[in-house]
Amino acid sequence: MTEPTVPSAGAPVDVEGEEQRPFSEHPGMARAYPGGRMTVGAITPLEGFDGPVPSLAGHMERIQQAERAGFASVWVRDVPLLDPSFGDTGQVFDPWVYLGQLTARTTSITLGTASIVMPLRHPLHTAKAAASVDQLSGGRLLLGVATGDRPVEFPAFGQDLEGRATRFRQALAYFRVVLEHRFPHVDSPLGRMAGTDLLPKPVYQRIPVLMTGHGRQDVRWIADHTDGWLYYTPPLQQQAANIARWRELTQGDGGAFKPYAQATYLDLTEDPLALPRPIHQGFSVGRVSLLGMMRTWQEIGVDQLMINFKHSRRPVADVIDELAEHVLPHFPPGRVGARGEHERPAGRAGP
């Protein structure tokens, strides 16, 4: 297998896509999803906080700490408006501006969105921003996409809430064609193009697109039109069934590996022996039981555990240090120079 390479910092920038690298060599995918084993990602902001708005104290330092600690990826949120009833504003800052900062302040960690609300943004704006981050980061971007689950946002943007599933499909198709073709002809309900092109093009043949939840789409459609699935933390048996179905639908794509990731809220307790206690979409647990849970998730086929620290009662800097010493060495990121661990190792259970 050809080894993936990150573009040289001294090379000309191929903004027109004349020398795009194969998608199979994508370094963002390689680090986040080596295949056959689980990695760990972090969802911004990396802090525990009450209420909907984080303090953002040391927010960039925590991400840099996570990169040094061995997190495979960091995921930024797209929350344009504060809805007090929803209780979460993500990292507050615009995701594309924040990712621009992250391209300059990190070196190797995969940069993801979890997720861009496609119906609320014109696909040309999304494509331009995504390709720009992709180029500036050396191909580290993974685009998590969503239909949108906050009803208050749609009328604010002049959008019909009930039509968001259709608009999502239209936006994703538009996004794909303008990034994957030169001077494309576009005739979409969202716009028309002829005789013009969108630059820059991505570093690799395409930007990986990962679906968040179902997005009011059929699972088969998700399997056919995206490169992976970001899901929540249902009971173990349900998650195993979800993954089995996902593998069934994606295993025929010419051997292409399409990862399945799980987002989980974590409150890592001071007591390393504390047994797991359910919290909102996650667990309060000591590191010993956490390690056992993570091994079980890996066995059923979870390709990445995406940790949300919002409910952490301890300083997240301390939590990251503890994970770095006792947990992350068991789930290291993929090596950018050695993608292709997609064959499940002997002894791995699950689908």
Label the model's feature ranges.
Residues 1-351:
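Active-site-adjacent structural elements that line small-molecule/cofactor binding pockets in enzymes
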